[in-house]
Amino acid sequence: MTEDKVTGTLVFTVITAVLGSFQFGYDIGVINAPQQVIISHYRHVLGVPLDDRKAINNYVINSTDELPTISYSMNPKPTPWAEEETVAAAQLITMLWSLSVSSFAVGGMTASFFGGWLGDTLGRIKAMLVANILSLVGALLMGFSKLGPSHILIIAGRSISGLYCGLISGLVPMYIGEIAPTALRGALGTFHQLAIVTGILISQIIGLEFILGNYDLWHILLGLSGVRAILQSLLLFFCPESPRYLYIKLDEEVKAKQSLKRLRGYDDVTKDINEMRKEREEASSEQKVSIIQLFTNSSYRQPILVALMLHVAQQFSGINGIFYYSTSIFQTAGISKPVYATIGVGAVNMVFTAVSVFLVEKAGRRSLFLIGMSGMFVCAIFMSVGLVLLNKFSWMSYVSMIAIFLFVSFFEIGPGPIPWFMVAEFFSQGPRPAALAIAAFSNWTCNFIVALCFQYIADFCGPYVFFLFAGVLLAFTLFTFFKVPETKGKSFEEIAAEFQKKSGSAHRPKAAVEMKFLGATETV
């Protein structure tokens, strides 16, 4: 009998759970590759002439029947009226596309507060089943969007899918953390992020024009996530409920033991029960803290502000601008096959997510965050230089492409996973739920801002757009250097002392045993 025994039930349960994480990634990446074909359909539905030569040249329309009939004179003379209509039409399409992308984050932002509540109210398994209803509704709206007002149906569908992902982004890590053996909790916990980046990559591959990313099949590409929702719902009936939920929340010791026996593969689960008993006693001895108290209580103010800044830094780094709009960025950079370059980004993202699993356990959280932000800053400079000088030197397109690949790599080394680790490690059991909720909300809010505004910023700044992100990255790198303490291998008392040095405020101490539960008590 070993603590790190991997059973078939455990593997099956983790894979089933991260199917939700997979959709999270799928919904992030799926909107990228078919951008031009969906925009052309928006124009068709709204009766807006597709007279943008660049748009026509950069996307192959299957037939002239797909476009609204437009008559042109042999010698057209543009009038102020016509120019105003063209500008207004272009602005309308840009707005609708930005909403199509960003509405996903609106849903996530709204639901991020309720994942923990839903899990505690219904249980982890039932909560994921209920969340799948949202996933299926969103998939149906997008899958049938070609039959109606596509822009409205896609925006509504992505909003509802965002609600699902907002719930699942809290439910899946919580469930995996509660079913995993202590020795495997860190490794299995990374499957959530790995499934997300795998979903991004798969959506980019099947979004290729010759697969589903074409005028005939793009709506199937968007609605395909409904299949995953049905599959996961069926598989969840064979998964055990979280033993921690059964024991700590419901006081069902017999059912908790049954669940543990299935997951561990042996009958003597006394050690797990004793650990949960201690955790329940720790939780009951500490008063819950509200979101308002995080900001009004001097003990928590500095940690929550630093936690929020880490999440703001993650999103305002420009990474989701890459994920949402990489095809158009590569197109601007002069890459002849931008969609394939986008798939390359997804592959690099997945590889370095796997690498980060080992780095996070070996190196300090703060160190990795600093390395990641510094590397992204340098890459953003090279991206912008490549775009600015592209007209003079054609080979600069490769500079921009390599810089984007490295940008994503540095993100996954530090700024991608680290904020979630550190927020959990900043706070003990009492304030942690509120801290994680407000951190998730701020993350989704910044995600929405980037998704909505990136296209406008890119249009306004042109090739200089990543100079703007470089400035933001530099500012957050300096903030991290001066304000963020190291948490790896430290107890709450030691982390509190670090914050006290930086702000002069005291943070409530807590026993180091809980840091062991979080996987943060390794020696440096």
UniProtKB/Swiss-Prot annotation:
Per the record, what ranges lie on the membrane's Cytoplasmic side?
1-10, 120-127, 180-187, 239-303, 360-368, 422-433, 483-524
User: What's the impact of mutating I322V?
Assistant: Reduced fructose transport
Protein name (database record): Solute carrier family 2, facilitated glucose transporter member 2
Q: State any GO CC term.
A: plasma membrane
| Signal peptide start-end | none
UniProt disease link: Fanconi-Bickel syndrome: Rare, well-defined clinical entity, inherited in an autosomal recessive mode and characterized by hepatorenal glycogen accumulation, proximal renal tubular dysfunction, and impaired utilization of glucose and galactose.
Species: Homo sapiens (Human)
Q: List, alphabetically, the PANTHER family matched.
A: SOLUTE CARRIER FAMILY 2, SOLUTE CARRIER FAMILY 2, FACILITATED GLUCOSE TRANSPORTER MEMBER 2
Residues that the record marks as modified (Phosphothreonine) are: T523
State the Gene Ontology terms under molecular function. D-glucose transmembrane transporter activity; dehydroascorbic acid transmembrane transporter activity; fructose transmembrane transporter activity; galactose transmembrane transporter activity; hexose transmembrane transporter activity
Q: Which gene encodes it?
A: SLC2A2
Q: In which tissues is it expressed?
A: Liver, insulin-producing beta cell, small intestine and kidney.
Mind telling me how this protein is modified after translation? N-glycosylated; required for stability and retention at the cell surface of pancreatic beta cells.
Where D-glucose is bound, by residue? Q193, Q314, Q315, N320, N349, E412, W420
Ranges facing Extracellular side: 32-98, 149-158, 209-217, 325-338, 390-400, 455-461
